[in-house]
Amino acid sequence: MEKTTRRLPIVERDEWLQPVEAQMNLRHERYERKMADIGRSAGSLVDYANGYRYFGWQWDDVLDGWWLREWLPGAHDVYVFGDFNNWQRTEIRMHKDAAGVWSAFFPAAMYRDRLRHGSLYKIHVHGDNGWLDRIPAYARRVVQDDETKNYTAQFWNPAEPFDWRGDAFDASKIGSLLIYEAHVGMAQEREGVGTYREFTEKILPIIKKDGYNAVQLMAVAEHPYYGSFGYHVSSFFAPSSRCGTPEELKELIRRAHELGLAVIMDLVHAHYVKNLNEGINSLDGTDHLYSPPGDAGYQQYWDSKLFDYGKEEVQHFLLSNVKYWLDEFHFDGYRFDGVTSMIYRHHGYVTFDSRDRFFDEGVNGDALTYLTLANRLAHDFRPSAVTIAEDVSGMPGMCIPIADGGIGFDYRLGMAIPDFWIKQLKEVPDEQWDIREMWSVMTDRLPEVKTVAYAESHDQALVGDKTIAFRLMDKEMYFHMDRASENIVIDRGMALHKMIRLMTISTGGQAYLNFMGNEFGHPEWIDFPREGNGWSYAHARRQWSLAKNGFLRYS
């Protein structure tokens, strides 16, 4: 591979990067080398990212049966078992190839009446950590037993494929993004977990009526702990079963497209849950299957496991996941969660006080290469796809086209904006707010870097924090939100609530995001069921009736 001889456009345009031109070239060359390797092995990046079409359950027309495949290079022995063989752990042995892929074949003549849609199964893995029952990494559906609370993989093969009814939604035609951040499980007013079907029937019309043109779905991939907000993923190819079936999620997306709404997935590739029973941690019995070995594979701040982005099989797994959700579920793009944690070995817990911070030994070059590949893949497979980076560090080139030497995201989250508003509300009386300071913070971005502006998201609504409405009006919201009341705190709070949003949406960026319910000043906080609150759903829901009853000022 020849070294870059021309000056990258990103460096040409930005004098600040010219002293680190060699490092910028090296970063881009790593991506180009990887693309060349993929081209030689698979022809194209789109064809390369087909792990979900090879691993897991795959039908073989020639042999008339099902293959089950799983990458477990460190395993000594692997069996598959389930209700189709009366849960006999060591009856159906899988066979290992030179690449560490274990497989078993299920002839239709023998298993047609036993291996049925909805069958439950696991793999029995003998690794360095002994014999364990595990869920395959490529499982497309995982369900929890109501009584034991144990998670089990489910063979998912509906009699008829989902009918998309000609869905060919193009997110590039909807104009400037107005994003409604939503969590399906907590979107209903009742205390409990909401469903995809309820969201489709009740919430999508609200989003459309309020003028948004995109919905960003949180907690899509399966996660064992509901209170993690979906950020401790266990099964990357399985939509959360607590909200319904894969087909019901597809119908949600199809209906959103009918309404003119793009659907963006909150994609978590920064880490994964450390649980052995539910997740992919040590799936083959080693500590370095999907993670770097030892402490390097542990995210101490989130108590979770890290991905080894430099390992080819891990890149293939994650890239296949990027394509999978676009292909199988028609998502229109991604908000990549935790990008700062991904691209730095210190996970961003430093002060970014010099240019060298973006190029020193603290940078994870493999993660940058992976993210560049992920953006290239998303846009090659779906040219209208939208990618958004959650990065607080300001890594150069994050939202610059790959061809120019950038990483290729379409947008970055304007994370300094909510921090600014919180600081103002906590420290500065509103009559002393400085309009010039507001303007400076709202417009502090490079002209070519598109920003998703937001005054608050789910982060600010969590227990221990406060929404803007609650900071402004606090306990008065409990007593004086009826239209008959006159209260200066409520009047002033509502006016500032609107002004903050007006300032943010009009000057903060090229797109705007709001978390569900915050648009009408939803009171209190989000607190998922946990032991500390008696496993209550009282604060894990949205009280839409507050804005609908006509007697309260939320409407």
What do the predicted segments below correspond to?
Residues 1-63, 67, 88-89, 96-181, ...:
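The feature marks proteins involved in alpha-glucan
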